Each structure stands twice: as structure tokens, then as C-alpha cells.
A protein has these predicted regions:
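Non-globular targeting/processing and membrane-anchoring segments
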Residues: 2-91, 96-121, 125, 143-145, ...
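Thiol-based oxidoreductase modules, predominantly thioredoxin-like and allied folds used
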Residues: 120-139, 150-161
Length: 241
């Protein structure tokens, strides 16, 4: 085995019996991966340097007890501006497809939030984060309880137009997923910074927020790729054979 390093850090693993064809294709892939990382940083820089966004309504949400195990009442009303814990922190909200015309929780949203719950304590070191759903508080909390979402702030949009205003709900109550970022200025006014949707263009189907989940990236490492796999709320038990 040969270890190639850059400044003492492992760059790539090469086994001694690799064919010339494999070596050539692997090097082509390595260079493409480097360019992808550089391009991703260029995109992130464009996002970071967006000019100030428009002011938004200080929407009201319904929130239950912090501890899911204590039940679903009492509930309280909390405003969008109150979700910020410090003046210099951004607020990130994931729009869960559940409620109104969406009578069952979206399996893909659920998979993403499963992962977000696991890293919520890391996210909280930098930004404020919450899940917003059109579902009633009790229904949202029941789903969260079943999934073990014990690290996330769970909010029901209730009668608010929040999801409609941000493009994750239509006039008939059909739901879509999205992730939104907000900032609050020195006067306490909340401004929209950025919202990403899964469907970015006709040829990019439900891949607009792939970076939120490691699932796709793990699958993309394999020769089988992601294929047409789609997440489910439950899976059959796999045998060990």
C-alpha cells in the first residue's frame, strides 16, 4: 500500500495491485472532487454576500412544552422575532411537509429531520434552528415523539401565512419542503435572507437541499449510487444474511 500525502496529510490511498486504467480514472475523479469542493465554496460565498433581504411579517407560531414526554399542553404563542436568542445569530427554519392537505408526514422531510435532530446540539453553537409544520401541535409532537426528535424546537404555523409567504404552501393547503434563513436587525425587525427548495429546476428533481442530509452523500460514494431510492417512514426488518 502506498500513502500519498500533501503537507503530511493523507491525500489518497493507493493499493499496490491497482491497474493503470484504475489509477488514471481515480486521478481524474480526484481532480473533479477538488474542483467540486472549490465550486461549492464559490456558491457558498455568493450566498453569504447576498444583500440585505426584505423585512417579513413577525409571524405567530404555536409551541408546546419543551419536553416531548410531558404531553402536548399547555401551548403558547411565540413570534418569529422571539426565536432569535442573540442579535448576531441567524435563524434557520425547516419547513416540514405535514398538515392541511398533507395528511401524513413527508418521508423525505422526516429523513432529513432525523439527521438534523442528531446534530442539533452542534448547530446550536452557531445558529438558532426550528422546525415549522402546518400540522396541529399535537400531531406534530406525536410524529416527533415517534421519531425521537428530542433536540429540536417544534412549531405549528397554525393560522399563520408563514408557509404560504415563504413558498412552502399553496392556496389549497398543499405542502412543500424548504429551508429558510432569517436575520434580525438592530431595531428588532426580521429580514428574510435565503430560502432553498428541493425542486430548483426541471432537471433537478428534489435535489435542491441534498446537502442537508448525509444519506445521499454516502450512497453517492458507492458504485450503485442513489438510484431511485426514496425514504420511507418505516422499513421492513433486514436479515443478517
Amino acid at each position: 500500500m502506498v500513502h500519498q500525502t500533501i503537507q503530511g496529510t493523507f491525500r489518497q490511498t493507493n493499493l499496490t495491485n491497482e491497474s493503470a486504467e484504475y489509477l488514471g480514472k481515480r486521478e481524474e475523479l480526484r481532480l473533479a472532487e477538488i474542483e467540486l469542493m472549490r465550486h461549492r465554496e464559490r456558491v457558498a460565498e455568493l450566498r453569504r454576500h447576498l444583500p440585505p433581504g426584505p423585512a417579513v411579517e413577525d409571524h405567530k407560531f404555536i409551541e408546546g412544552p419543551v419536553d416531548l414526554d410531558t404531553g402536548d399542553t399547555p401551548t403558547r404563542t411565540v413570534r418569529l422575532s422571539e426565536l432569535f436568542t442573540a442579535a448576531d445569530r441567524s435563524l434557520v427554519i425547516y419547513h416540514l411537509m405535514y398538515g392541511k392537505r398533507q395528511t401524513k408526514p413527508c418521508p423525505m422531510c422526516t429523513a432529513w429531520i432525523d439527521g438534523l435532530n442528531g446534530v442539533a446540539h452542534h448547530i446550536a453553537q452557531n445558529v438558532d434552528f426550528a422546525i415549522v409544520s402546518a400540522a396541529e401541535p399535537a400531531a406534530l409532537r406525536a410524529h416527533a415523539r415517534a421519531r425521537g426528535w428530542d433536540r429540536l424546537r417544534l412549531l405549528s404555523a397554525g393560522d399563520s401565512t408563514f408557509k404560504y409567504d415563504l413558498g412552502s404552501e399553496d392556496r389549497e393547503g398543499k405542502q412543500d419542503s424548504a429551508i429558510s434563513v432569517f436575520n434580525r436587525d438592530s431595531h428588532g425587525t426580521v429580514h428574510h435572507f435565503y430560502t432553498a427548495h428541493p425542486w430548483m429546476s426541471p432537471e433537478i428533481k428534489e435535489r435542491g437541499i441534498d446537502l442537508l442530509s448525509p444519506i445521499w452523500h454516502v450512497l453517492d460514494l458507492t458504485p450503485q449510487g442513489r438510484g431511485d431510492w426514496y425514504s420511507k417512514l418505516e422499513y421492513p426488518m433486514r436479515s443478517s444474511a
